[in-house]
Amino acid sequence: SLRNAAKDCLKIKETNPSAIEFVDKSTLKNFDFKFKKNTDCLLFVEYDSDIEKNKNNLKNFADGQIAKISKSRKEIEKWWKFRDLALSYSLKSIKQEDRIPHIIEDATVPLEKLGNLFSIIEKLNKKFHTNTVMYGHAGNGNIHVRIISNRKKIKILDEISKTYFEQIIELGGTITGEHGDGIARSRFIKNQYGPTNYQLFKKIKEFFDPEEILNPGKITKPRRFSTLEKV
């Protein structure tokens, strides 16, 4: 399960891997490998040394099963290409009419809270009758989430994003780990950094850009995410 995979990530991290990456089951059908039918997700774990030792460690403590051990450069590159194409695969798996804006795109939590992040997504899907595609950098708790829902239900994004970000912040996480805030997430910046820091951001912006020329409508003077009205 996703939560068991999150627990495994904590143990794997202690073995000093060079990478721990994650994709959920929605992308597995795109790879030329026969996964077991009950596979919920896949962790890509890479080591630079002590391969046999770490392989045995994983067998001893991992809840999931080792699907494949790759040592040749060609085969390793094949698996990493699959991971790198997760975004493309995720889009292919979503029907055009079920593609809605990605506001809760790449939140990040402390690794020990990764299971909580998956639980939050599970509850939101149940409450709003949505589905999700997830992939990301499990080793540092950074998970990319794409909501699947009919565009006619786009207004639910407001409540989903508000609930999700509030709970991510409560876990000690950040609403975006890689992609920045932009128009989509700027209205949540004050919640992330607090009123004192937010006022400081505004003063810095007013000092260097009093005419609002650079990136207007972002971070300190957020405007409503226009896609919500137009899609």
Predicted feature locations:
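Noncatalytic alpha-helical scaffold of FAD-dependent oxidoreductases
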Residues: S1-V231
